[in-house]
Structure formats: structure tokens, C-alpha cells
């Protein structure tokens, strides 16, 4: 395993080279091992995914369960906010933030927080909300009310466990789009500098055009 930033194999020339036993995914135009770069770029994306998933699912589950069931008037406001957030593309938001003084603080963790908030308050909230409205009219909820159960207790103990699969399934899919959004913004240099797949694609195209053609195994 070579250093993903400054690693250079002096025994291999010229660069880029095709996949071999020494370099399973070949080298890029600067002589760096593509596999090492790929593995180094996976760590930040894993952190992004973890932050995005848990923040998004926490927001969507708590707000999506309690507000439609307990605060019905407030739910009308949140519904409009969520509908508006659906129209906002996370890659565009990252590009806008990256054009200012926020580039250095747009780390994978902070991007995961931003994307988790957008996803949790966006489509995921509406998905959980629709499930809560449907469940709140079922017989076991009415029975719990007749027995004197408080709304917060019913929402957290009876309704929330039922809607968890809805939130989990959507956030798992949404996290994938978060990775794509970060790679997209990184390709244009609008996020903090860190090894990632977006920069690998950028280097493959940019340096390849100057130093002997694009190495397509890097792009793949």
C-alpha cells in the first residue's frame, strides 16, 4: 500500500500504468497508486454516510412522528417546508457554500450533517408523516387513547416503532445520494480538501489530458 498523496513507485515508468500485480488498479498520471487513493477516499465517505444517516433518521423519526400526531397545525407549516426542501438539490447547496468562505469547513462530517438535515426535513419527513397519519386512525391507537394514554407516549411507544422501517429504508437510499453530492462538489473544488473519489476523477481527467491521456481504470 502506497501513500495516497505522495506515494510514487520509481520502478514503474511511464505513468499512468495499467493494472498489475504491484498496482492492482494501476497508477494515475502522477504515479500514485490508484488502489491506495481509492481506499483513502473511502474513509471520508464512510464518515459522511454515518453522519448523514443518523442525523437524518433522528430528525425524520422524532419530528415526523410527533408533529403530525400531536401538533397538527404546526404540521401544516412543516409540510410546506419539507415540500420546499425537496426542490433544493444538495449538490447545488454545496456549490453555493463552497464559493464563499466555507470551503475549508466543508469536511465530510459537516457535509454529512448538512445532507442529513436536508434529507430528514425533506422527503423522509413526508414519508414518515404519511405513514403516521395512516397509522393514527387504526384501532390500536384509538384503544390506547381510551385507556388514557398521552399523545407523546402513544407517538413514541406505539407509532414510532411502526414507522422506523420507512425512515431507515429511505435514509439508506438517501445516503447514497449524499456520497454522490459530495463527489460532485469535490470534483469542482467546492469542499474542503481531502482524498476522495471526486478528486480522483478530477485528477484522472485533468492530469491525463496534459500527461498522456486519461487513465480510464482510474475513472472506473
Residues of each region from the PLM?
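Generic hydrophobic transmembrane alpha-helix motif, especially the helices
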Residues: 24, 28, 32, 55, ...
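Short helix-to-coil transition segments within interhelical loops
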Residues: 27-32, 70, 143-162
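Transmembrane alpha-helices
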Residues: 43-59, 152-185
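Transmembrane alpha-helix boundary and packing residues in multipass membrane permease domains
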Residues: 65, 95-99, 111, 142, ...
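C-terminal transmembrane helix and the adjacent membrane-cytosol boundary/short C-terminal tail
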Residues: 103, 115-119, 171-172, 211-220
Amino acid at each position: 500500500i502506497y501513500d495516497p498523496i505522495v506515494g510514487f513507485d520509481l520502478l514503474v515508468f511511464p505513468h499512468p500504468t495499467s493494472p498489475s500485480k504491484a498496482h492492482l488498479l494501476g497508477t494515475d498520471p502522477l504515479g500514485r497508486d490508484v488502489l491506495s487513493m481509492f481506499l483513502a477516499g473511502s474513509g471520508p465517505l464512510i464518515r459522511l454516510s454515518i453522519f448523514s444517516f443518523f442525523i437524518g433518521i433522528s430528525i425524520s423519526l422524532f419530528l415526523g412522528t410527533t408533529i403530525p400526531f400531536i401538533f397538527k397545525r404546526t404540521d401544516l407549516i412543516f409540510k410546506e417546508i419539507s415540500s420546499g426542501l425537496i426542490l433544493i438539490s444538495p449538490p447545488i447547496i454545496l456549490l453555493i457554500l463552497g464559493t464563499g468562505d466555507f470551503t475549508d469547513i466543508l469536511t465530510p462530517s459537516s457535509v454529512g450533517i448538512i445532507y442529513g438535515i436536508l434529507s430528514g426535513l425533506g422527503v423522509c419527513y413526508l414519508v414518515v408523516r404519511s405513514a403516521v397519519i395512516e397509522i393514527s386512525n387504526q384501532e390500536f391507537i384509538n384503544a390506547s387513547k381510551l385507556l388514557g394514554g398521552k399523545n407523546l407516549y402513544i407517538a413514541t411507544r406505539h407509532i414510532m416503532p411502526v414507522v422506523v422501517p420507512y425512515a431507515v429504508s429511505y435514509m439508506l437510499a438517501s445516503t447514497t445520494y449524499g456520497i454522490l453530492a459530495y463527489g460532485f462538489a469535490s470534483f469542482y473544488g467546492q469542499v474542503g480538501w481531502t482524498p476522495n473519489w471526486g478528486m480522483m476523477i478530477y485528477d484522472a481527467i485533468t492530469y491525463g489530458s496534459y500527461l498522456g491521456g486519461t487513465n480510464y481504470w482510474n475513472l472506473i
